[in-house]
Amino acid sequence: MSKLTNCILNKDPSCVPVWFMRQAGRYLPEFRDIRSKNKDFIKLCLNSNLSSEITLQPLKRFNLDAAIIFSDILMVPFGLGQDVKFEKDKGPVLSSFNLKRFFENDKNNFVKKLNPIYKAIETTKMNLSADKSLISFIGAPWTLIIYMFGLKIDKNQIDLNKLQRSEEEVKIVLEKIIKYLCIHIEKQIKAGADTVQIFDSWAGLIPEEKISEYCFEPNRKIVKFCKENKIPVICFPKGLKKRNSDFVNIVSPDCLSLDYDTDPVWARENLHNVCLQGGMDPKVLFKNKREILKETDRYLNIFKDRPYIFNLGHGLLPETNPDMLYEVVERVNNFK
């Protein structure tokens, strides 16, 4: 059993696994080299050999406990027929959502379009040390709907009136997305993934009266599916803050990933019967070595004697110095 799996499932606090969101990314010169030759991000995600190579890059530099497959949460909307492009300074841009075309999707076509991802997982698993975990991931239904419907986020706020769709239509689309996310998870597990992380990046924008319908229930259904398939599941509902307590009680993830706005002391005292992950602000890594290690130690000591995975409160930023990340990884691995 890998260190990560032992921590998540057995709630073993005796050692602290370490990995990072976006650990295979733009802060690494070897990634930038591949990216410079592959301008189309979606095509890069669908290149099984390159995807696997990128996935393994950080493990060649750092003593990490897990690889996370190089892909994107928007590969599911792509598999469901929407065009997905990443424009400089604008981020992801999707073609207009067409309800009729959305419901014309079938499992075989969806799986065929995303098959290179599953091949990349198979290749990565073959080249990954047996003591390392292989994490696959999905975007939560609410977060995907924001992109699929083309909703604009302004100053971390969203106007649900701009959904321009009936509540019934949103509900039907949510259920359909859940179905295809479970198909995607199942295929990733069969390919060799041994852990799943669910990114609900925009959970914090959901109004209180809709939090159960748009966040808790969709995540609960997917977590239930993961547990039925005996796969450890990590949830990252960004922006929930103290609503994380309700999330844990209702959704019952094996592990909850904390964002950088969540007070770690509050999390330690209020989130029970769940492994915790992350929390440290990625911008801490822009500071000097002494300050970086001081904050690393703070998180390690706050969660001492709790099942805890060291990570950040969001993905690694492109400006991150790999040398500083190396120092953090060594600090975690030497923590007693």
What role is predicted for each listed range?
Residues 1-86, 221, 323-336:
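N-terminal basic, low-complexity leaders that serve as flexible interaction/assembly modules and, when applicable
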Residues 31-33, 82-94, 147-159, 271:
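Short, flexible, mixed-charge acidic loops at enzyme active sites
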Residues 33-45, 99-110, 249:
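Short, basic, glycine/proline-bearing loop/turn elements
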Residues 40, 96-101, 263, 281:
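Short, solvent-exposed coil/turn linker segments
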Residues 68-85, 98, 103-110, 193-211, ...:
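Glycine-rich, proline-tolerant flexible connector loops at the mouths of alpha/beta enzymes
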Residues 73-76, 91-92, 141-143:
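A short acidic, glycine/proline-enriched capping/turn motif at secondary-structure boundaries
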Residues 89-127:
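A gly/proline- and charged-residue-enriched helix-loop-helix capping module
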Residues 113-336:
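Active-site loop segments of alpha/beta catalytic cores
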